[in-house]
A protein has these predicted regions:
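Extracytoplasmic surface signature
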Residues: 2-10, 19-512, 520-524, 652, ...
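Residues within well-ordered beta-strands of beta-sheet-rich folds
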Residues: 432, 488-490, 527-531, 591-599, ...
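Short, aromatic/His-centered strand-loop micro-motif at the edge of beta-sheets
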Residues: 636-659, 707
Length: 742
C-alpha cells in the first residue's frame, strides 16, 4: 500500500556545537536539510478507533481501519459534528476534512476491519483489503475494488479471499495481496497471491508458511518484496523477508534466520529509486524492531537501524526515510538509552543516524503502539505527510487516529534557551547556554544580547537533538571588575525565533574565586555548581561543556551553599522522584575522581553521585558511585566482575555540609570524607566496561551492599566535579579547606 514517491540528494546533518571565536557561523534555516517535512501538526479530522491503512490519489487521502465515526480536530468523541464512518474515510489532503466519498465496510459475523489500501497507477481505482463481507451493502469477500471517481464498488472485480487481507500493491494489470488466507477464489494460495485488475487468476505463486503482512513492487515492476511472519516461501527458507519474481512468484532472493531473528517479523515495506526499506517488529528477547535499507540493485543490506520499539510503517520523502514506531532504546545506534518512547523518526536513506524531526504521538489504544501507517499526498504545491494509528494525542494535544504534517511553512518555535552566567576570574564573564529543542530543526542559531542592547554581541549556530542538547559557552572579556552586566539569549531556526531568555545578572569578579579556580586548575571535566535558580539546566563550569538536566523538579537556588563566603547556591532533592544526569554519553573512565558536597538528615539513604547507562529512567547498569546507607554511612562502589565496595565507619547524616571524594586508579579504590581518607582497597584497579552518564541525586542501587531504603537521596548537594585522573590526598585536603574556610 504505497503512496507518493519523491527523490532528492541527501545532505549530511550537522552535529555538535561551535566554539567561541570560530569563524562566523552560517545562520540556521527552517527545516534542517535533508529534512523537508515540518513537525507542526495540522488541523485534521480524527477517528474514534484505529487507523491501519492509507493510500492517496490526486490530493485525496484514503484511510481504513477499525472505527465507526470521524469528527473535527479539537472535538471530543460524541461531539455535535461527529459523523458515521464505518472502517473507512476519505479526506482532502490539504484541509484535513472529509470528502463526499463515504463507504461502509461491514461483515455479517465478527468485527469488520480494513487493513490494506492501494491505488492503481492511473489513480482511477482504490483496492481495499481486510476482513469484511460488504461495501455499502454490495457483497464482497475481504477484497474490493472502488472506482474513485464515483466512489462506488466495482462489481466486475469479484475476488473471494477466505481470510484477512493485510497487504496490497497494484500495477496497471495486477493486484498483489498478502495476509492470513489459504485460498483465493477457491484455489489454494497460502498468505500471498495475485489477481488481474479484472479479478481473474494469474500464474503467480508465492506460498508462505505464515501470514503475510507487507509487500511492495520494485520500481521496474520485475519483482515483489514480501514481508511477514513466514519462515519459508515456496519451500525455500527465508524468514520474514523475501524477493520474488513478479510474474511467477519464484524466489529471487531469500534471507536466512540470521538476517532477521526468528523473534521478529516485517510489518511494512517501501521503495525508492535505489532502495528497499523495511519496518520490523519483534516479540520477546533478542528482537529486531528497527529498520533495514537494502540496495535495489542486489537486495543486499545498505544499513540497519537496531533501535528497539516496534516499527509499523516506513515512508520515503525526498531521500529521507520517515517511520512510525515506539522507539524507546537507540543505545545500539550510539543515540539515546532506554527512555520515554519516540513515535515518529527520520533518517537518511543512505545513513541510519537520526535526523532532526521529532513530532510525537502517544501509544494510544489497542496494543498501545502509536502510529501504524503513513502516506504522502500533494495538493496545491504543498506536500502533506499523513499518519494514522491508535494514538490519542499528537505533540501533546488531544488528536485521535489521524494527523498530518506539511512541507511548509514551518511555524514551530524552538524552546527558549536555558542560560547561566557567572564570573569566577577577573576580566571575564562566562555565558553558558543549553541548546534549545526544535522538533524539525536540529541546527539553530543563538544570539547573545548584553545589557539590553538590540544588537547581539555574539552569534553562533549549533546542533541539538532531544536526547543530546550540547552546552555552548561564550566568554565575554569586555567587562570591568566589579561592574554588573545582564545577558539574554534567543534561538532561531531561520524563520521562527524565541523570546529572549530570562535575564542573567552578573557582577564581574574583582579577585579569583578560590574554590572553583582550584577545581578547574586540577582538571575537572565536569563541574556543576548548581547556581541556577530556575529551569531544568545544570551548567557545566568545566571546559568540557558537559551540562546536565534536572528530572522531577529538585529545588534550585538553595542558600547557603556548601562553599563558605562565596554566595553560591545548592540543589535539594526530595529522595523519591528527583535526580540530575549529564547530557553527554561517556566511555567508562579508567582513572577518575568523583567529588561533591552534601548535607542531609535522611534515614533512608540514597545515591549521591554515580555512573549509569540511562538518563530519564533508572539505569540497568550502575557503578562508580557514592551512596549513603540508612544509617548515614557512605559507600563507594565499583563493578569489577562483581560489586566491590568500601564503606566509612562513621555516619554523615547530621545536617552539616560534608565533602566526599571517591577515587579509583592504579592504586585501587579510596574514599575521603572532609579531607581525610576513610576507606580504601588497593586491589580493585578496574571496572566493567560500558558507556553511560553521570547521575546526581539518585539512580538504581539494586544488588549493592547495604542497599538503602531509597535509591534517591533526600538532601542538598553542591559543587559536583568529575576528574579524569586520581586526585592526590593533598589536593583533596586543599579542596576541603578551601570549601570550609573560603
Amino acid at each position: 500500500m504505497r503512496k507518493l514517491r519523491s527523490i532528492s540528494a541527501a545532505l549530511t546533518m550537522a552535529a555538535g556545537s561551535l566554539a567561541a571565536g570560530a569563524m562566523a557561523p552560517q545562520p540556521a534555516v527552517a527545516l534542517t536539510p535533508p529534512v523537508a517535512m515540518t513537525a507542526d501538526s495540522l488541523p485534521t479530522w480524527q477517528t474514534n478507533g484505529i487507523v491501519f491503512a492509507m493510500a492517496q490519489a490526486n490530493g485525496t487521502v484514503f484511510t481504513g481501519g477499525t472505527f465507526s465515526s470521524v469528527r473535527p480536530s479539537g472535538e471530543a468523541a460524541g461531539g455535535p459534528n461527529e459523523r458515521e464512518a464505518v472502517n473507512f474515510a476519505a479526506f482532502d489532503a490539504a484541509t484535513g476534512a472529509p470528502t463526499d466519498c463515504r463507504l461502509s465496510f461491514t461483515v455479517g459475523s465478527g468485527t469488520a476491519t480494513v487493513r490494506a489500501l492501494a491505488v492503481s497507477p492511473d489513480g482511477a481505482t482504490l483496492y481495499a483489503g481486510g476482513f469484511f463481507g460488504a461495501v455499502n451493502g454490495t457483497p464482497v469477500s475481504s477484497l474490493a475494488a472502488i472506482d474513485i471517481a464515483t466512489c462506488t464498488v466495482r462489481t466486475d472485480f469479484a475476488v473471494a479471499v477466505n481470510a484477512t487481507v493485510r497487504a496490497l500493491a497494484a500495477t496497471a494489470d495486477t493486484v498483489y495481496l498478502g495476509g492470513d488466507f489459504s485460498s483465493v477464489d477457491g484455489q489454494p494460495h497460502d498468505n500471498f497471491a495475485a489477481v488481474t485488475t479484472s479479478g481473474d487468476a494469474t500464474s503467480f505463486t508465492a506460498n508462505g508458511d505464515a501470514p503475510g503482512r507487507a509487500l511492495e513492487i520494485t520500481p521496474d515492476g520485475a519483482n515483489v518484496v514480501l514481508g511477514g511472519d513466514f519462515d519459508r516461501v515456496n519451500g525455500t527458507s527465508s524468514h520474514a523477508l523475501a524477493v520474488v519474481d513478479a510474474t511467477t512468484g519464484a524466489v529471487v532472493k531469500g534471507y536466512g534466520s540470521s538476517f532477521i531473528p526468528s523473534t521478529s517479523v516485517v510489518k511494512d515495506i517501501t521503495t525508492d529509486a535505489t532502495g528497499v526499506y523495511t519496518g520490523n517488529e519483534g516479540t520477546g528477547g533478542g528482537v529486531f524492531d528497527g529498520r533495514i535499507a537494502l540496495n535495489l540493485s542486489d537486495f543486499n543490506q545498505r544499513w540497519r537501524d537496531t533501535c528497539l520499539g516496534a516499527t509499523q510503517s516506513v515512508e520515503v520523502y525526498k531521500s529521507v526515510l520517515y517511520s512510525g514506531s515506539h522507539a524507546h532504546d537507540c543505545s545500539t545506534m550510539n543515540e539515546y538509552p532506554n527512555q520515554r518512547r519516540k513515535h515518529l523518526l527520520a533518517e537518511s536513506v543512505d545513513n541510519p543516524a537520526k535526523l532532526g524531526w521529532f513530532p510525537d504521538t502517544n501509544d494510544g489504544l489497542g496494543e498501545g503502539i502509536g502510529p501504524r501507517v503513513m502516506a504522502v499526498s500533494s495538493s496545491g504545491g504543498t506536500d502533506y505527510m499523513w499518519v494514522g494509528g491508535e494514538f490519542t494525542t499528537v505533540n501533546g494535544v488531544a488528536q485521535q487516529g489521524l494527523t498530518r504534517f506539511s512541507s511548509g511553512p514551518d511555524t514551530g518555535v524552538p524552546t527558549t534557551p536555558n542560560v547561566n552566567a557567572s564570573s569566577v576570574t577577573p576580566g571575564s564573564v562566562k555565558v553558558r547556554i543549553q541548546t534549545s529543542l526544535d522538533l524539525d530543526d536540529s541546527s539553530l542559531t543563538y544570539r547573545v544580547y548584553k545589557n539590553g542592547a538590540a544588537t547581539p554581541v555574539y552569534t553562533t549556530t549549533a546542533s541539538s537533538l532531544p536526547w543530546v542538547r550540547p552546552q555552548l559557552t561564550w566568554t565575554d572579556t569586555d567587562v570591568t571588575a566589579g561592574a554588573t552586566y545582564t545577558y539574554r539569549v534567543t534561538a532561531s531556526d531561520g524563520t521562527n525565533t524565541t523570546v529572549k531568555s530570562p535575564t542573567q545578572t552578573v557582577t564581574a569578579a574583582t579577585t579569583p574565586e578560590a574554590y572553583p579556580t582550584q577545581v578547574l586548575t586540577d582538571g575537572a571535566t565536569l563541574y556543576w555548581r548548581y547556581n541556577e535558580t530556575a529551569n531544568t539546566f545544570v551548567a557545566d563550569n568545566s571546559p568540557a561543556d558537559d551540562g546536565g538536566n534536572h528530572v522531577g523538579g529538585p529545588t534550585r537556588g538553595v542558600s547557603p551553599g556548601a562553599i563558605a563566603g562565596n554566595g553560591s547556591t545548592a540543589v535539594t532533592y526530595n529522595g523519591t522522584t528527583q535526580w540530575s544526569y549529564s547530557d553527554a554519553k561517556r566511555n567508562r573512565p579508567n582513572s577518575y575522581s568523583i567529588e561533591t558536597w552534601f548535607r542531609t538528615t535522611t534515614t533512608t539513604g540514597g545515591k549521591i553521585v554515580g555512573f549509569g547507562d540511562r538518563t530519564t529512567e533508572a539505569s540497568a547498569t550502575t557503578d562508580k558511585h557514592v551512596y549513603m546507607t540508612n544509617a548515614g554511612r557512605l559507600i563507594f562502589g565499583v563493578r569489577s566482575g562483581s560489586n566491590r565496595t568500601i564503606t566509612t565507619s562513621g555516619a554523615y547524616n547530621d545536617g552539616e555540609w560534608h565533602h566526599v571524594v571517591a577515587t579509583q586508579g592504579s592504586s585501587g579504590m579510596r574514599l575521603y570524607v572532609d579531607g581525610s581518607l576513610q576507606a580504601s582497597n588497593f586491589l580493585i584497579t578496574g571496572g566493567n566496561d560500558y558507556v553511560g552518564y553521570w547521575h546526581v541525586g539518585g539512580d538504581n542501587l539494586s544488588g549493592w551492599t547495604s542497599r538503602p531504603t531509597s535509591n534517591y537521596f533526600a538532601g542538598s548537594i553542591d559543587e559536583t566535579a568529575i576528574y579524569p585522573s586520581v586526585l592526590s590526598a593533598s589536593q583533596i585536603a586543599q579542596h576541603y579547606n578551601l570549601g570550609k574556610n573560603g
